A protein has these predicted regions:
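Alpha-helical segment of the N-proximal tetratricopeptide repeat
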Residues: 294-314, 318, 339-355, 359
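Cysteine endopeptidase catalytic domains of the caspase/legumain-like
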Residues: 2-300, 310-327, 368
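Short, charge-rich amphipathic alpha-helical segments embedded
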Residues: 317-336, 362-376
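A compositionally biased, intrinsically disordered/low-complexity signal enriched
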Residues: 287, 291, 341, 373-376
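Compositionally biased low-complexity repeats
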Residues: 25-27, 41, 337, 358, ...
């Protein structure tokens, strides 16, 4: 028979621990993840941090309740098979599934199309890339066709182009992707802005993955707020050289971790986004009023977190001095160029590429635009 004092001790312990929040995966949905880390490239120097990033992300996602499939150093055939096997796993998990893909390695854009780079890619000319690589759109379309609750794609894939045969023929970084044009319930994150290159980092992990590993561990943090903080953290770590970017068509909230008190909020509908039909000038004016009178550093971090053209335009009008003014103007110019490029690629006619060249006659996309303008 248990002694009364022991019973009292047990009751006290239960009461004490009942008031301590329990950290766990944020909801009861099924969670599956595919983590690809491409380090051992055969035709170009290795990317050691990509493998490190993938291993650390697999650990994080496992602790967040994901059933993780790790797939390192994939050839083209292996990558396609891994995506196919993952799609089957997602489908078998049912419609209440969060499917997440993390990719670390090289990425390329050819003619406005983004490609994930297998370790056996060895192009002799630009035309070899579509034959030897894996289209990002193929991954997105495969996930988009599955009846899932949510699709999350994280790409630490915008490192410099290391292939000599492609020097001067491809655009920098990756092309802009708009999730609103595909399946709803999709979130895609780039490690840097469209048309920009990401850093591999001086430590064991890239600046992007370092920030992801730190920020997402905070309990009850909605995914879109998490990636705003990740953007600011990476921007600070790289002194403005790298700014992560994301596109979202999510219709429900998602949190990597939650306490018991955050469970109900984890499944609540997302608040309505700002009306996209509001004129750009009006959005700029709202940001102008928001930033007015703020210290440059505070205003800079606000617009970096928002990462919208309207926010950058308002900042550029108010703050001209270094270091923040030139950074934002450069970022704004490149963002406008990448939006114009995405529009030209979507229309895909000679007049569309001619219009792009009229605004952007020089730069890393000009050669491809000239080819597009010359098409019959």
């Amino acid at each position: 028979m248990r002694h009364p004092a022991c019973n009292l001790l047990l009751l006290t312990a239960l009461l004490l621990f009942s008031h301590i929040p329990l950290l766990h995966a944020a909801s009861s949905e099924s969670r599956v993840a595919l983590v690809i880390g491409q380090s051992a490239y055969r035709a170009v120097p290795a990317l050691p941090n990509a493998g490190n990033d993938a291993r650390r992300m697999a650990e994080l996602l496992g602790s967040a309740g994901f059933a993780v499939t790790s797939a390192p150093d994939l050839s083209q055939n292996d990558m396609r098979q891994a995506i196919s096997d993952f799609a089957a796993k997602v489908s078998a998990s049912g419609p209440d599934t969060v499917a997440l893909v993390f990719y670390a390695g090289h990425g390329l854009q050819i003619d406005g199309e983004n490609y994930l780079v297998p370790v056996d890619l060895d192009p002799k000319r630009e035309a070899d890339v579509p034959l030897q690589a894996v289209r990002l759109n193929d991954l997105m379309n495969t996930l988009g066709a599955l009846p899932t609750k949510m699709r999350i794609v994280m790409l630490d894939a915008c490192r410099n182009n290391p292939f000599p045969a492609l020097s001067g023929t491809t655009g920098h970084g990756l092309a802009l992707v708009d999730t609103k044009a595909g399946a709803s319930g999709t979130f895609i994150s780039y490690s840097t802005s469209p048309g920009a290159e990401a850093e591999d980092g001086n430590g064991d992990d890239s600046p992007y993955t370092t920030a992801v590993l730190s920020v997402t561990k905070e309990p009850n943090l909605p995914i879109e707020e998490a990636f705003k903080r990740i953007r600011v953290a990476v921007n600070q770590a790289t002194e403005g050289r790298q700014i992560p970017w994301e596109s979202s068509s999510l219709t429900a909230d998602f949190k990597f971790f939650a306490t018991d008190s955050g469970q109900q909020a984890a499944t609540a509908p997302k608040p309505a986004e700002p009306n996209p039909l509001v004129p750009e000038a009006q959005r700029v004016e709202v940001w102008h009023r928001t930033l007015q009178g703020k210290e440059p550093k505070v205003a800079y971090e606000l617009v970096i977190a928002d990462d919208s053209v309207a926010a950058y335009e308002a900042f550029a009008a108010l703050y001209s001095q270094a270091p923040y003014g030139p950074r934002v103007r450069s970022l704004l110019e490149r963002r406008r160029e990448m939006i114009a490029w995405a529009d030209a690629v979507a229309v895909n006619t000679a007049p569309a590429f001619a219009a792009f060249l009229a605004s952007y006659p020089i730069g890393d996309l000009a050669a491809t635009a000239h080819d597009g303008r010359a098409r019959p």
